[in-house]
Amino acid sequence: MRLDQIEEPEKVQEIKARFFREAESAGRLSHPNIVTIYDAGEQDELGYIAMELVEGQSLKDWSRKPNLLPLPEVVQTLASVADALDYAHQQGIVHRDIKPANIMITKDRLVKVMDFGIAKMASSSRTQTDVVLGTPTYMSPEQIAGKKVDGRADVFALGIVLFELLTGQPPFAADNLSALLFAIAHHPHPEVQTLRPDLPPLLQEIVNRALQKELPQRYRRAGELAQDLRACLHSLAA
């Protein structure tokens, strides 16, 4: 990242702080399903992050028809993502931008969560209230409202990813950004079984619980989501 080419010099420090926050947060994480950050620094006005080289494809490549993954692979993959998020949340870190493009499947079929670029360290004194960060399609209602978020925002985003990988379309869509954000915050998500009648009831329940707008009704931890996904995977193999 060229720090000397930022058009508004007064924003350099803010951008630098956000850039190095990725290294600070992700550098604390050591998990087989999270891309490893090795180093970060600044040299000759160039900010850099050295990270694990991941060769493979992102889930974005398999989020639209006719390229949808087989059902068992979808469930297994997102269970691994949920494991990674549960670990990060236990370290006090919320990803805040979970989406198919940030989930890689390597050539060896390993799942890797990447890009903690807007991750929020729960212990940080810098408030995120009234600051909306993330990719709009995958934002939780509390992110849209600018409220303080925790790991349940990542659970909601992972629920959207699950819906998308199962159906080939996101649960919320609109003609403009304002309408999209309003839909996520206020409209019920479509029932996934209307688009995929072949899905087992347990998987439908998992999608519904992950996409609950009210926090008390949503999965409390990503680990609970991973557990239910593996129970579903077991039932598929039975």
Please give the residue ranges for each predicted region.
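Conserved ATP-binding/catalytic core of the eukaryotic-like protein kinase fold
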Residues: 1-190, 233
